[in-house]
């Protein structure tokens, strides 16, 4: 008799996963398509089936029958009838409304007239519509993006079939000289090209830049690439020159340091959000050329002002690249509406099993505050408590012990508070890179790390995003942005470039019985969803880590 499955599906749309069950890995991978992890204690993980998760799954080609079948296949007990009905009804809402284009402009259509009437009567939708036409309602020319946002809020996400401007033609070919696209990268490009807009979710280190380059080659058009910072812009430039037929003269950088507009222009999010006299000073880059494709790197970090700008770019093809759709500001639905639905998602452990990213062992090392620190902590307000606990001087000695256990590993020590990082830099005799470090100096230090002349770097949040340090195999995290799941994923991602079968090590140092420990649990949720387990160690048990990674 076969063992009952690892899932318990509950009538409130939560799903419990028994972590120790032999089929837990397969069930977790199946759940990622349409559910979100809410809690991840040691033995039972709790997922929630959300509307946005179901709509993303539907946009990626999954049906209600397939999703219910997945739950049935892995469940210990029958799936509640109400949950199955709810899934069918929620999936059925996606695409009931469509946005199309006729000779006069944009039209909102539906075969379900009551739905059309319901949305037409919404006070927030009314200003976006111009009046009835045969089979639908005329959409105001500028309102395509804003209408999609409002329809998601009403629970009727529209399928956008209005097409895209081709942009100015630009011949771009992949130059596969000594390398070739991995199967999952090719699949991601195919899914994006078929749809014309949307988000590709791949683990850190899995080659999202190559997916972007291949999407550019598939569209053969002028392209605007939006990235997190100048270092990332230069890495994109180097990759495009190495992987495509593009030349130096065809790629421009639009950032704080440079203002070039070329057929392929790489701009930073920061420059787009600069204001002068209450106006965005650099919006001209969005209309500088007839862009046929806009690539949003690290789309989960898209600043709120750029959402408004993106709402006006709905006629352009849009590709979002990210390791996680998690946004700490809760604006996942805006990514869905304005960039597009999730088109492709490759689970981290699946890519690891194929050998394309390194395996990683994760540790949480708990330290005790001394008595004076505990008294100061007890007398402090909530926000100051995290700073006190996260930047405890006790962490410096613990970091030194971790590094002593990994004497030859290329190491990143990552934190949030600059005074703490200054102390660590001095204690470890290692260079410090922060947001204040000039870009030219950062690049010199990153290159020294790649070449092995610097083995340890102490870095602030600047290393969270799009920094190519393929040899890093040890990261020690001492503080972060409170309970940020996306930051945890980005930091682990610094270690996941393939290492010839060697396992990377990711340590988080936390102060026991404080909000630092509570936030650490929250930060780990996304990686638990991807199948990573944290080994909990006391600071005096650090030798155990050697046995785990050996």
Residues covered by each model-derived region:
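Post-DEXD/H (motif II) to motif III coupling segment of the RecA-like Helicase ATP-binding lobe
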Residues: 293, 300-363, 527
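Conserved helix-turn-beta segment of the N-terminal RecA-like "Helicase ATP-binding" lobe
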Residues: 230-257
């Amino acid at each position: 008799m076969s063992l009952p499955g690892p899932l318990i599906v509950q009538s409130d749309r939560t799903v419990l996963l028994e972590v120790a069950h032999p089929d837990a890995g397969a069930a977790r991978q199946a759940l990622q398509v349409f559910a979100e992890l809410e809690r991840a204690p040691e033995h039972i993980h709790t997922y929630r089936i959300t509307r946005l998760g179901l709509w993303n799954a539907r946009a990626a080609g999954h049906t209600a029958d397939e999703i219910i079948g997945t739950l049935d296949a892995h469940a210990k007990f029958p799936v509640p009838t109400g949950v199955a009905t709810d899934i069918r009804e929620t999936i059925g809402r996606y695409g009931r409304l469509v946005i199309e284009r006729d000779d006069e402009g944009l039209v909102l259509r539906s075969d379900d007239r009551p739905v059309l009437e319901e949305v037409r009567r919404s006070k927030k939708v009314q200003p976006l519509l111009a009046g009835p036409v045969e089979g639908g309602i005329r959409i105001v020319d500028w309102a395509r993006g804003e209408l999609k946002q409002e329809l998601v809020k009403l629970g009727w996400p529209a399928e956008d079939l209005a097409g895209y401007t081709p942009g100015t033609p630009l011949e771009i070919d992949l130059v596969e000289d000594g390398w070739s696209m991995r199967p999952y990268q090719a699949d991601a490009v195919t899914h994006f090209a078929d749809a014309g807009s949307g988000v590709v979710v791949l683990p850190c280190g899995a080659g999202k830049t190559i997916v972007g380059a291949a999407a550019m080659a598939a569209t053969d058009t002028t392209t605007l690439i939006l990235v997190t910072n100048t270092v990332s812009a230069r890495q994109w430039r180097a990759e495009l020159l190495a992987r495509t037929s593009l030349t130096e003269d065809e790629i421009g950088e639009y950032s704080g340091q440079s203002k070039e507009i070329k057929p392929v222009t790489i701009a930073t999010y920061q420059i787009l959000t600069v204001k002068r006299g209450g106006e965005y000073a650099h919006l001209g880059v969005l209309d500088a050329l007839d862009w046929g494709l806009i690539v949003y790197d690290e789309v989960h970090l898209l600043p709120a002002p750029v959402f408004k700008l993106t709402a006006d770019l709905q006629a352009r093809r849009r590709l979002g690249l990210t390791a996680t759709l998690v946004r700490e500001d809760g604006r996942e639905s805006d990514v869905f509406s304005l960039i597009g639905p999730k088109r492709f998602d490759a689970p981290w452990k699946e890519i690891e099993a194929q050998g394309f990213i390194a395996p990683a062992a994760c540790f949480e090392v708990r330290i005790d505050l001394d008595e004076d620190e505990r008294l100061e902590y007890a007398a402090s307000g909530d926000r100051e408590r995290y700073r006190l606990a996260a930047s405890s001087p006790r962490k410096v000695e613990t970091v030194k012990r971790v590094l002593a256990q990994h004497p030859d590993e290329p190491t990143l020590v990552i934190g949030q508070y600059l005074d703490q990082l200054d102390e660590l830099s001095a204690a470890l005799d290692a260079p410090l890179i922060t947001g204040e470090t000039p870009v030219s100096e950062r690049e010199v230090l990153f290159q020294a790390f790649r070449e092995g002349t610097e083995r340890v770097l102490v870095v602030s949040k600047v290393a969270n995003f799009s920094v190519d340090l393929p040899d890093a195999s040890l990261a020690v995290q001492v503080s972060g942005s409170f309970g940020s799941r996306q930051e945890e994923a980005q930091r682990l991602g610094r270690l996941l470039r393939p290492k010839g079968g060697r396992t990377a090590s990711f340590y988080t140092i936390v102060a026991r019985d404080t909000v630092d420990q509570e936030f650490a649990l929250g930060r780990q949720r996304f990686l638990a969803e991807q199948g990573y387990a944290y080994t909990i160690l006391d600071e005096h048990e650090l030798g155990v880590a050697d046995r785990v990674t050996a």
